[in-house]
Amino acid sequence: FKKVLKKLDEIKKDIIAITGDYINDKCKNKSKMLAFGKELLKRAPVFYITGNHERRLENFDELMKELADIGFHVLLNQTAQITIHSSLITFLGLDEDQADFKDYKARKNGTFQYKDMKPYFDELDKLGGFKIVLSHFPENFEKVEENNYSQYDFDLQLSGHAHGGQFILPFIGPVYSPGQGLFPKYAKGSFGERPQLIVSRGLGNAEIPLRLFNHPEINVVY
């Protein structure tokens, strides 16, 4: 955590966005991550959504309250606004609830029933400012047929989940992402213009404690 905080201190920042999997599904690191969260809040406001790891926790509601209590803006299909340098920023944080391992299989074989997020995008549409959607799953930007997020009116989607494809092969690219499978399109980088999708490779490793040609990253958006 010291390395991450040191790097953050070198970056000019107004907001910190966390797109899920902040605490793993065994919750063994909760006390450390709460302490780390307090350090983040000393540096900038934190806007947070859940990932598949948090959603698998039995004490999910308790954890959400603890994160809110330390000062995180916990967004569970909710909007929030903040003014930075006289500019209004509007967040929509999505709680997509695609956490079960059986969900991964269903998504791969095309039988998964995605949640209808249109009501939340309709709420976002009523608000002004620069609109940022926080979504754990980058593939939902374009891969969910009639429910894909890119059809809606917003500026930027920030996502994670794919760990950069875990392994990146020279001349081939990212190898695997849960939910996308082999050679995923949305593993890292930027896609589109407006709306634009930025996929972070993130800082953690989850079940596979190894990366190959795939450095962890903190994404800086100007």
Predicted regions and their residues:
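Conserved beta-sheet core of the metallophosphoesterase superfamily
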Residues: K65, P138-N219
